[in-house]
Amino acid sequence: VGTHSVHLLADFDINAGAPGSGTTGLPQYAKFGRTIPTQMWDGFLSSNYHSLQVAVNRSFSKGLMLKGAYTYSKAIDYTDADGWASVGFNWGPSFERNRAAAGFDRTQVLQMGWVYELPMGKGKLIAKSGIAEKVLGNWQVNGIFAAYTGTPFTISGPTASLNAPGNSQTANQVKASVDKLGKYGPGQLYYDPTAFAAVTAAATFGNSGRNILRA
C-alpha cells in the first residue's frame, strides 16, 4: 500500500534569515524594520507512505478465533501536524533538510487478537454435565497483543552559533555511528550521548538530520 500527498498546508517563515545574518539580515528588516517571524500559510508540502501489509483472519473454529495484522512501512514528510504544522528549516537553500522520516513513523507494527472457548461444558472435553457443567461451562478467554517500533526524533542544537532567526539547528554527530545502549528508566541511557556535540562553528546548521534516531 502506498500514498503520495501534495499541496499539504503548513507554515513557512518568509522572514527567516540566512546562517550568520542575525536579526539585521532578515529579509524584511531592511524594508520594514521587521524582526519577528512572518508566517505564510500555504499548501507547499508533500508526503509519501509505502508499506507491506499482511493480515491473518481465522474464523471461529474448534473453539478458536484469531485475527492479526503486520505492517512494514515508512512515512516521509517535511513536518508533522502537532496542532500547528510548521517547518524547522525556513531559509530557502536549507529547506530540503526538513524532509525525513515522519515523526509518527513506525517501521514495524504487529497486532494480534484472539478468542478461545475453553473446552468445558456440554459437548466439550470435560465438565460435560452436572454442577461442573453449570459452573465451568461456556467460558471464553480473549486477548489483544500489540508490538511496534519507536517513533523518530531529532537531536537539536541551541541555535546560538547558527545565528539565523527562523531556523532550527541540529547537533553535530561526532562518531561514525550512534551506539544503542538499550537501557531504560530514570537516569538510564538508551543511546550513547557522546556520539553528538554542540555546534561550535559559526553559521552552521549541524551535520545530523531531522528524525535520525528512534525512541
Give the location of each predicted region.
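Short, solvent-exposed micro-motifs at the edges of structured domains
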Residues: 1-215
